[in-house]
Amino acid sequence: MPKIDTTVTLASSGTDIRRSGFSEHTFLGANTVMLDMFENYKDFLGIQADGFPQAIERNREFLKTAADLEIIGTRSEQDAFVVTLQITNNTGHKLPSGYPSRRVFVQLAVTDDNGSVIFESGKINDDGSIVGADGDRDFNKVEPHYNSVINENQVLIYEAIMANASGETTHSLVEGIRYLKDNRLTPKGFKKASADNDIAVVGRAANDGNFDDGTDLFEYRIPVSQGGTYQVIANLIYQPLAYGHLEHLFRDTIVPEVDQFKTIYDNTELKTETISTATSQHVQ
């Protein structure tokens, strides 16, 4: 942290209340989407502050330290090959943390010798929805946790999804009473077996023996009809405003600020950030 050249006031009254030798602190987060909206709609929102592009870059670099995605290896099977990957959570909390609008997901694509995409799971649409994600297609559904992804409509999404008193999916903090799914990546040292109920892993991940203690080990089964050389690229992607959460918010047609926010969001291109990328080559 850079040192401050000037002195700092320590109290509102008294003598000798200024001190030197202090450092400048920068508070970082991960919501570059909101910062981008502030920058592009400063006049409309009445924002006078500057420096949003620089803040976006600082937060973007900070986010890249949150987790590592690795391709552990590949193996051939009849009419398919399998890619094994591992995510390591480098933060001291669940990832994503905090407000349940946030989600982290894996986007994995495979191309053949001609550069044509033969498989893609986790493809993101322009509106922020994820192809194949059950909760993005139907508000009442939840995309389950996977230890093995076998088709393009299965997406590995790390998220916390709440239920209301009737057991229905909700994105409202007022209505939410429990989790239907909480497979957010656990921090190192976290043990599912001894975790209290209020921080427990919920859903299929609770029974996934490869999901615990800050890591998740999983695989993708890629169907192939012939031999060849295949390129694999996998991205761990962070989305601060999940599509399903926003769709729940946008159902409110009474509060004018909701419609204003929807207009700004719909015209914002930046909707996700890449945390980590891994590549590999497989010869079938």
Predicted feature residues:
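Primarily the internal scaffold of c-type cytochrome electron-transfer domains
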Residues: 1-200, 208-211, 218-224, 232, ...
